[in-house]
Structures are given as C-alpha cells and as structure tokens.
C-alpha cells in the first residue's frame, strides 16, 4: 500500500474570519486528534498570502513532531500562533510566530503537512470521517477563547 502526503490549508479561524496579524490564535488539537495518523511525520508552517514563509526575527518557521511539542495533561495539543514569544517556556516550545500587526493587511495561512498517510488515512481526512486538523481559535483580549482553551501568556 502506498504512503502519501497531504497538506491541509487553513485560511480562516473557527469564526470564519481570515487569519491576520492583528489577532493571536491557538491551534487546538483535541486528545483524540492530537497525534495525526502519519507513518513518518507532521508539521505546521505559516505562509503569507503570496505563498512565502512568514518571516520572523526568531528564525522559527515550523512546529512539528520532531520539535517535541509539549502536550497537555489530557493529551491535547495547543500550538500558539502569535507575533510575540510566549513568556511561559512550555508555551514557547509550541509557538509558531505569526506576522506582526503592522503587516496585518497581508494576512497569512496555516499549512499542516501530513507525511505518510495510508489510503484509509487520506480518505478519512478528505471526507471528514477520520482525523481532522486543529480548531484554529482566535484569542480574546483577556487571553481566553470561546471554547475554553487558554491562549499563551
């Protein structure tokens, strides 16, 4: 059986608003979906609307299973997407720098790369009967989300 790759793209957050540098986000994987069904590896990367990597002063361009992200006690996984580095070291480990608010008009997209999906795995991702990507939750000014997931501090 062949193993293939799939690259789901997120252009909008959970509220269907376009991704922008004026907001902070949490990409929340539930305990059931925190580990994508891949044989090889997965990664998450931000690109601007022209298709280029989102430049940042930290030279940090992805979070993946090889970067050993910090999972929550319940098995879920939160990836923090924001321009500023989280003060909490565990959150900083799961941080993906987004464009600063000054470049908000350009927006960005989140690409999740899944390497080594089986035919069954691809079908489940594509038709919605299997693994699905994270909820991309916008952070409120007080650091909360509508689904009770905490944003980075």
Predicted feature residues:
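A compositional/structural signature for long, glycine/proline-rich flexible linkers
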Residues: 1-153
């Amino acid at each position: 059986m062949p193993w293939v790759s799939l690259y789901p793209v997120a252009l909008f957050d959970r509220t269907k608003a376009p991704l922008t540098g004026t907001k902070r986000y949490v990409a929340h994987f539930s305990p059931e979906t925190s580990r994508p069904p891949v044989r090889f590896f997965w990664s998450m990367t931000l690109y601007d609307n022209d298709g280029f990597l989102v430049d940042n002063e930290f030279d940090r361009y992805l979070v993946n299973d090889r970067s050993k992200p910090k999972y929550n006690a319940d098995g879920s996984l939160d990836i923090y997407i924001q321009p500023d580095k989280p003060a909490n070291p565990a959150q900083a480990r799961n941080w993906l720098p987004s464009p600063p608010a000054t470049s908000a008009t350009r927006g960005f997209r989140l690409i999740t790369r899944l390497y080594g999906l089986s035919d069954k795995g691809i079908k489940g991702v594509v038709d919605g009967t299997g693994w699905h990507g994270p909820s991309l939750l916008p952070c409120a000014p007080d650091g909360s989300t509508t689904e009770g997931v905490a944003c980075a501090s």
